[in-house]
């Protein structure tokens, strides 16, 4: 049995065992928060994980990649005031969203444990945080979402983009489970659980995008 890394419940059950060329993995669904996770024994080591990320085509100049990121950025940008300061959490080897936000006149810093690992960045507080195609790599999503919440100023917004499942019975056929760096999988119900646990509001303005809002007066 494997404890849920989001809500820490033991009420989980295995929904799939893969047999990909990179090795077999087990996937467990939590009955409490609806997260599917891969147990730690199947996680890649740091060197293998970083090498996998370097295979991604995240060129900041790629118009198709920018179009992809704009699904989240356009929603976040529409809610920002002039002078808003932001953080791109999990910025990756090609921090395209940092380039896009900077071009739109916003101050934004990158943070990534492999590619922009300056921990001093995490000592600040931000008006907005973007987290694109990163949450699926969280090994301890309960801890990591709490960290994101703590990095937001009161009244701030957190934009998360990750593929979400509408039907876990289809999980074995979902291409998303084939990437060995993907170890946490979400539904809307999962992210609603996150928002409730952190006393935030959340809505889903477009496919695979969640916008969390921290109250102006923190409860």
Describe the role of every protein-language-model region.
Residues 1-128, 132, 145-146, 161, ...:
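Conserved N-terminal segment of class I S-adenosyl-L-methionine
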Residues 155-163:
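Conserved beta-strand signature within the Rossmann-like core of class I S-adenosyl-L-methionine
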């Amino acid at each position: 049995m494997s404890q849920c890394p989001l809500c820490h419940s033991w009420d989980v059950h295995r929904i799939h065992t893969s047999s990909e060329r990179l090795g077999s993995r087990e996937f467990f669904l939590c009955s409490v928060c609806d997260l599917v996770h891969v147990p730690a024994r199947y996680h890649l080591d740091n060197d293998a994980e970083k090498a996998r990320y370097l295979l991604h085509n995240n060129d900041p100049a790629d118009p198709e990649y920018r179009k992809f990121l704009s699904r989240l950025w356009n929603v976040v940008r529409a809610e920002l005031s002039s002078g808003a300061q932001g953080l791109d959490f999990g910025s990756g080897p090609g921090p395209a969203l940092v380039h896009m936000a900077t071009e739109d006149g916003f101050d934004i810093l990158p943070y990534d444990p492999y590619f922009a690992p300056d921990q001093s960045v995490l000592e600040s507080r931000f008006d907005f945080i973007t987290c694109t195609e990163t949450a699926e790599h969280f090994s301890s999503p309960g801890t990591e979402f709490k960290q994101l919440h703590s990095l937001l100023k009161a009244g701030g917004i957190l934009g998360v983009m990750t593929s979400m499942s509408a039907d876990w019975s289809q999980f074995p056929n979902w291409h998303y489970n084939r990437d060995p760096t993907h170890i946490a999988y979400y539904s809307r119900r999962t992210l609603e659980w996150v928002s409730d646990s952190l006393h935030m509001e959340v809505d889903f303005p477009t496919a695979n995008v969640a916008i969390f809002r921290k109250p102006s007066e923190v409860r």
